[in-house]
Amino acid sequence: MRASGILMPVFSLPGPFGIGTLGKEAFAFVDFLADAKQTYWQILPIGPTGYGDSPYQSFSAFAGNPYFIDYRLLADVGLLTADEVPAARPVGPIDYGALYNERPVILKKAADRLLAASSPAYKAFCKEQAFWLEDYALFMAVKAEQGQAGLADWPDDLRCRKPEAIAAAKQRLAGAVDYYKAVQFFFYTQWNALKTYANSHGIQLVGDIPIYVSPDSSDLWTHPELFQTDGAVHLTSVAGCPPDAFAADGQLWGNPLYDWPRHEAEDFRWWKQRIKHATSIYDVVRIDHFRGFESYYSIPAGNKTAAGGHWEKGPDRAFIDAIHKALGEGGIIAEDLGYLTPEVKAMLAASGYPGMKIMQFAFDSREPGNYLPYTYPRNSVVYTGTHDNVTAEGWRQSASAEDVAYACRYLRCAPEDLTEAMICACLSCVSDMAVIPLADWLHLDAEARINTPSTQGANWQWRLTQPLTPALSAHIAELTALYHRVPGEEL
């Protein structure tokens, strides 16, 4: 089925609380998507973030981000008073430090009221999500007690989950544990309401899960045996990418690597739980760095760059077969960008999952792969760019003159029309699914870039300040229909 969607992080939505939330602006964006005849809203990972603010480095593979909870919705159900809802602030780049200081104070008031009410819905949520919720809440409570220290710096008995230390922590931190569980109830109550609304308006949510967990996460703390660690929950090897034309030293991500033989011995139980959870909150799931299931780049822990790493074999088709058997064969997008061997391509083909194509890469002379539209298979998802790319307009302004000239010759357009031409090339190509970042529909420049890989600083901060007008939704709808991406209206 030919269809299209828009990439827009939740945190980039407008709104009065310093960050995009699951409140009325999210519902209004669903309305905009429906008016624009879109099928998909693609977001970035929604887990709780810490130092660096990256949604790809979360404290949990299962929890939701407390920053996305909308205060107004809590007030609507009596969990906050009108006076406790902060005054609206101008929409601008996200100040994560301010959120870090403000959010717990306000959410604690709502949590106390929820816990005092003995809510049956809350109790049911805790029971249903117990497989991750209890450990996550205890992890966050201990982390707070330790002054927000990373897991690697915790006292040995807590880091290694010595039974006596864990029992004492559960008793000592019972109130904090209840708070973190209540916050997750708030998040998922609001998330589920948004998903129900989106689905009722013909919009499917495309989620995103990183292949790796964070080194400072409840997942590593709870299941160290599933990762490449020593006996004291210290990492022995970490994840990253080898050097290439975009990064001379490679990318040192620092995430824990999986102990794949242990996962396979357990029939990939943890991964099945993770993907099952993802498919319960999203309609489609993008798995980041999918090639890592075939082989992964391993860097000795402690290395300062990724240059000294090497490739190791992953579970390959054994993983794919286990996921197919447990969860079926659809609903997943495989992020397959970067260095792809014949073995990776064979694994992707065996999975049946669509891979990704990036229109910007088609005209980037540094990119060794061929991303020109004539090479795309139908079973693929095409983007002008992703969160890791500069906007299309920003690319036009910053790419080499030769690359821009080549793109204009190929797309038969003037330089000032290149963004629209890239969008049309995506929509017109044979890929079953086309996803355009909202910033490209608005022709925004590099100021709207979401992330620059391997950099610290102003990442994950962009927010929408431009109005989403009826004229824009009509324009998007017109092109979507022109290229036969309106479900039910295909040729």
Describe each model-derived feature in a short phrase.
Residues 1-11, 27:
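N-terminal regions that are enriched for targeting/export leaders
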Residues 9, 53-184, 188, 213-435, ...:
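Alpha-amylase-like alpha-glycosidases and glucanotransferases acting on alpha-linked glucans and related
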Residues 180-213:
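Conserved, well-ordered alpha-helix/loop/beta-strand core segments that scaffold catalytic motifs
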Residues 44, 204-206, 210, 284, ...:
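Outer-envelope exported proteins of Gram-negative bacteria
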Residues 24-31, 189-197, 271-273, 418-422:
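Short alpha-helical segments and helix-capping/turn motifs at coil-helix boundaries
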Residues 24-49, 280-282:
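Catalytic domains of carbohydrate-active enzymes, especially glycoside hydrolases
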Residues 34, 191-199, 324, 348-349:
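Surface-exposed amphipathic alpha-helices with a cationic face
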